[in-house]
């Protein structure tokens, strides 16, 4: 009897875990990073190594610049200098 109760408990635990994993639609990963504010200053172009755009699931769009020191800096994609840096990084 104890074995049946233990097995049933384990089955319920596994079912609860699988339900939460399978309940999300396929491909609906939560965004890995979102920006809630932008840098107030222009970054020196020499410090910027790469960039990425935040997910469309974020509350506001942003371009995240990756610096030589490994920092991630959020920038406003409507700023002219941000577009200039993105274009420059795409060409190189």
UniProtKB/Swiss-Prot annotation:
Keywords: Chemotaxis, Cytokine, Disulfide bond, Inflammatory response, Secreted, Signal. It comes from the Eukaryota. Residues 1-23 form the signal peptide. PROSITE patterns: SMALL_CYTOKINES_CC. GO terms for cellular component: extracellular space. One of its GO terms (biological process) is positive regulation of calcium-mediated signaling. InterPro entries: Chemokine_b/g/d, Chemokine_CC_CS, Chemokine_IL8-like_dom, Interleukin_8-like_sf. Pfam families: IL8. It is found in: Secreted. GO terms for molecular function: CCR chemokine receptor binding; CCR1 chemokine receptor binding; CCR5 chemokine receptor binding; chemokine activity; identical protein binding. Gene3D superfamilies: 2.40.50.40. Disulfide bonds join 34-58, 35-74. The keyword Transmembrane helix does not apply. Belongs to the intercrine beta (chemokine CC) family. Monokine with inflammatory and chemokinetic properties. Homodimer. This is C-C motif chemokine 4.
